[in-house]
From Swiss-Prot:
Organism whose genome encodes this protein: Pseudomonas savastanoi pv. phaseolicola (strain 1448A / Race 6) (Pseudomonas syringae pv. phaseolicola (strain 1448A / Race 6))
Classification via InterPro entries: FabA_FabZ, FabZ, HotDog_dom_sf
Keywords, in A-Z order: Cytoplasm, Lipid A biosynthesis, Lipid biosynthesis, Lipid metabolism, Lyase
Official protein name in the record: 3-hydroxyacyl-[acyl-carrier-protein] dehydratase FabZ
Catalytic-site annotation from UniProt: 49
Keyword Magnesium set for record: no
One Gene Ontology biological process: lipid A biosynthetic process
Keyword Lipid biosynthesis found: yes
GO cellular-component term (any): cytoplasm
CDD domains: FabZ
Function: Involved in unsaturated fatty acids biosynthesis. Catalyzes the dehydration of short chain beta-hydroxyacyl-ACPs and long chain saturated and unsaturated beta-hydroxyacyl-ACPs.
Signal peptide: none
Subcellular location: Cytoplasm
Amino acid sequence: MMDIKEIREYLPHRYPFLLVDRVTELDIENKNIRAYKNVSVNEPFFNGHFPEHPIMPGVLIIEAMAQAAGILAFKMLDSKPSDGTLYYFVGSDKLRFRQPVLPGDQLVLEAKFLSSKRQIWKFECKATVDGKAVCSAEIICAERKL
């Protein structure tokens, strides 16, 4: 549904911090999104986390979920970063890690809009690999005008 070219229109992140490779489902009416991150052994973070037993850092899994949520927020408002608005990841609730993400895994990212109040948006997010939960959290983002 969204290729990397279109994703780059909705996320200000760039290599090595752009963590969404593809969006396959985006349902504005039901306020949810499904996106993917293909985890390659060539990711720069594997050089130090951990060279002999590479594991994707948990904070980057959270960031990937937040980026998927950001795309959903922009699409819900029919806006883009180029319009002068950004969403900053400002917190999480109910955060849980369930298993490690390894080189070669395909991370499935899902986000559902829960609520917004005074430019603070909350999303229910989860990440899975091969149908197994690896991370879940309520992600909180702040909308900011540039």
